[in-house]
């Protein structure tokens, strides 16, 4: 039924966490190839409003500023206090994380911009909304983690860093979690309020985790 999707050549879902919005919508990010070329990849949203009985795909995906021929992939989403969605995108070719926003529950997105304060390898990471003033906390805290070493033919990804933002993604600070080769990572808020980190450590991506 969708003339655009009829031309898609390949789709896979980003590994790791999805997100549930305050209105109940559950969503994951799809990585879409719209031609027979490897890149660019486009980040459309797969979402359900009925607990998974039916699924829809967003009309739009973020354009990628300064790197349109390579794009980005394996994005993750958090919901900001005003309902705006923030998408963090794995970069391809430009080693800075890309951020984009949506104000219509993920149906359309603005252009994703690279962030100089989020140096990033081309590797999957995660982002979570850790604490919100809407829930009685003293600060808004968004946490993200990913590898910071550029991923090239001669340099594997590594040196994962944990970053935090107190102003809903406007500015970021971070620190090194591990020195050396590393792969994908995922974050979770544990029952005691601490942050759980699941990460691939080493250059083979076969363990340990």
PLM-predicted stretches and their roles:
Residues 1-209:
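Asp-box/BNR beta-propeller blade signature and adjacent active/binding-site loops
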């Amino acid at each position: 039924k969708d003339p655009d999707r009829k031309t898609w050549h390949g789709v896979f879902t980003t590994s790791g966490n999805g997100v549930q919005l305050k209105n109940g919508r559950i969503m994951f990010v799809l990585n879409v190839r719209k031609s027979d070329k490897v890149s660019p990849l486009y980040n459309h949203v797969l979402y359900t409003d009925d607990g998974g009985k039916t699924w829809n795909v967003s009309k739009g995906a973020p354009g990628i500023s300064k790197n349109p021929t390579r794009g980005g992939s394996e994005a993750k989403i958090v919901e900001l206090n005003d309902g705006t969605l923030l998408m963090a995108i794995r970069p391809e070719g430009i080693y800075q994380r890309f951020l984009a926003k949506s104000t219509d529950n993920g149906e359309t997105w603005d252009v994703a911009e690279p962030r100089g304060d989020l140096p990033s390898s081309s590797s999957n990471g995660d982002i979570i909304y850790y604490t919100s003033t809407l829930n009685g906390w003293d600060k808004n805290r968004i946490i993200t983690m990913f590898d910071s070493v550029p991923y090239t033919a001669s340099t594997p990804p590594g040196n994962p860093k944990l970053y935090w933002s107190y102003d809903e993604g406007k500015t970021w600070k971070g620190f090194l979690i591990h020195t050396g080769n590393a792969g994908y990572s995922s974050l979770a808020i544990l029952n005691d309020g601490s942050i759980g980190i699941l990460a691939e450590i080493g250059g083979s991506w076969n363990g340990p985790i």
